[in-house]
A protein has these predicted regions:
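Acidic, mature catalytic/reactive cores of soluble proteins
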Residues: 1-163
């Protein structure tokens, strides 16, 4: 979910007032085709703007399905820092015969790592929620009514990111 937070909406008028940035942006768009596909141009409110974001619109929509899924990240109190799916299916990584795992661990940690704090392994963590809300506001400001998502996932209720 963290890549969702790397987003900014820049009015084209602002870009034009920054000739060095505009020159680099034009070079980037002309030469970095794979990465440039993540830059969207459109209207933000009443003014032409550019959306600079890590996920493309298609990836954003896929990520939002997980973010807004109550079986995954969305909870009655905020967004979990790790999907609840990992409660029954821990993430396991094998590196040269050594096994590493991350469990969904709400509340007190089952290990002494990081002082026993398990905030980054499941429960709602204020810093992540703050960053996600700010990012979703930016996406919502850029896409407006042109992007609707099901909230919560599976409910059939469609809404904009501004709602």
């Amino acid at each position: 979910l963290i890549p969702l937070c790397a987003v900014e909406v820049l009015p084209l008028a602002t870009i034009r007032r920054l000739p060095g940035f505009e020159k680099r942006l034009r070079w980037f768009l002309a030469n970095e085709h794979d990465l440039a596909s993540h830059v969207c141009f459109g209207e933000s409110g009443d003014e032409p703007s550019a959306l600079l974001a890590i996920p493309s619109r298609a990836r954003l929509e896929r990520l939002l399905r997980y973010l807004l899924d109550e079986r995954e990240f969305l909870s009655p109190y905020g967004v979990r820092s790790l999907s609840a799916v990992h409660k029954d299916q821990p993430f396991v990584l094998d590196v040269q015969g050594q096994q590493y795992r991350v469990d969904y661990t709400p509340g007190e940690s089952t290990t002494a790592m990081f002082g026993g704090n398990s905030n980054w392994r499941g429960p709602i963590w204020l810093p992540i929620n703050f960053l996600l809300i700010e990012a979703l506001e930016r996406y919502g400001r850029f896409f407006g009514d042109n992007l609707k998502v099901e909230c919560p996932t599976g409910s059939g209720r469609m809404c904009t990111l501004q709602q």
